[in-house]
Structures are given as structure tokens and as C-alpha cells.
Amino acid sequence: MSTETNNNLCIGCNKPFKSTDNIKTSNFKKYHEQCFSQDLNCSKCSGPIIASAEHKQVLGKIYHSKCFTCASCSKVLSDNDFSEISGIPCCKSCFTEIKFNPNFAISKFGSASAITQNDEKTKEKFEMKTNLYNNLQKGKDICTWCRNQIQADPDNEAVSFGGNIYHSNCFTCSKCSSSIGKNQFVTGSDGSAICKSCSDKSKQVNCFACKKPIDSTFTVVSGNKYHPNCFVCSQCKGSLEKGYIEKDGPVCGKCAATFTQPQTRTFAYSNGKGARPNGRW
């Protein structure tokens, strides 16, 4: 069955023309003079805009007054109380939330996969919010760690590392989690950033006895390193300058004489370049 347009009805108000009416024509459509508005359509609902209906022209587009709403929360907007992101209208409240909370558009609706294909209205809303966020962030750097926008801030400058960008206070040591910021650091074997303090500790040699760093000469015994003053008899804590034997640790000759089994006497003093040749008791 085919339908024909009634040429005696105004497209704007759907009322019949009178013989006394001035008729306007556009795109083969007829309007009462008071209903004619250059055959414009609403940018949101695509419905015709007629002169007798409330409408407004903003951001280079024309809307029914009731259709000029925030793309984020659907609040009806007034002429002087709205913001825009890349030509998309939104209320000032949503604009602020989107601008200063980069995860707002996504966190409010969840991931795209969580939106059912049947719920087209919800899906459309989600896409609109995501587009608002993406348009706002175009050309702006996002911190790899906190996912917030990196603003021009002399107290929190950006740091680039490994192809990523961070707020300086978000750029931290992979070992101790302290902030590296703009300070010196080294790159670990796994490609992570390590602060200078942790790097120095990893290279540091500690005394086996006192656990403190060794920064000069040392003695090597059974693969362990000692400060010269820390290498003492494990029994009496006396000097081992004349040699030692291994008995649950280095033992001096006097203490060794108390043992029933003969032991091997060993000399192993070093200036840090290696042990001396071993001798026999």
C-alpha cells in the first residue's frame, strides 16, 4: 500500500491551509508562513523546526529548546549556562567532572562490553560520554601511573621513561617505591627504574660478620668477606692473624686444641684482591 502526502497540510503544524494563507515552499514541502523556518531540522532529534516552536541556535547548530541538553547527564541547558567539548554541549558540572577526572566517562557506565547490544539508548549514552572524554584529552599527555592528565605544573613536571610519560611524583623506584622525580636513576635488567640509593646498595659489599659496608681492604674466608677487624675466632673472639681452622666458623689455634679431631689450619688474608695461599697446621 502506498501513501501520498496531503499537499493541503502544513508540514510544520500538520494543519490544513486556508485560501487566505500565505504558503511557503522549501524542498517541495509546504508551510504556513508562520510555520516556515527555512526547513531546518533539530541537530539532536532531526525533527523539523518550525517558527512557532521554541528553538535556539548555538554552537553553529539549531535545536528544539527541549532538545538542547547536556550530552552527559541529559539536563536541559539554557543559552548562557553551558560548556562545550569539541562542539558537544554539556552542563558545567559534567564538564568539570570530565575535565578533572579522566576516568569519569568510562567509570560511570563501565566498559563497553558490559553494555548490552539491545540497549541502544544506554550504548549511545556511553559512546557519547567516552567521546566527550576523548575529545577533551586529544593532544594532552596522560600519566602512565595514575591515568590523570599531566598539567603544566612547575612543581610536578612530567618525566619520560621507556616510551611512557609520568607525573614526576608518580615516577617511582621499582625496588623501594620512593619517588624518583627528576633525580638520577638507573635502569634495571628488567627495564624498570631504580633509584640511585637502591642501585648503590645492590653494588655494595657488606661484611659477613657486622653486616656493614666494606669500603677498603677485606679478608675472604669460604667465599665470605670480612673487615680485617671483624675476622676473629668464632669461639673466643681473639685474633686470627696466625691462622685459623674451620669448625662451625673460623677458630684460632688455642681453641682448636680443645677439639678432639685434628683440623686443617688455613691462611686466607686478603687486601681485597684475593686470598693468600693456604698453609697447613
UniProtKB/Swiss-Prot annotation:
Keyword terms: LIM domain, Metal-binding, Repeat, Zinc
GO molecular function: metal ion binding; transcription coregulator activity
Any one cellular-component term (Gene Ontology): nucleus
CDD domains per the UniProt record, alphabetical: LIM
Ranges where the LIM zinc-binding domain occurs: 40-101, 141-205, 206-262
InterPro entries associated with the record: Znf_LIM
Pfam families: LIM
Protein name: LIM domain-containing protein G
Organism: Dictyostelium discoideum (Social amoeba)
Name of the encoding gene: limG
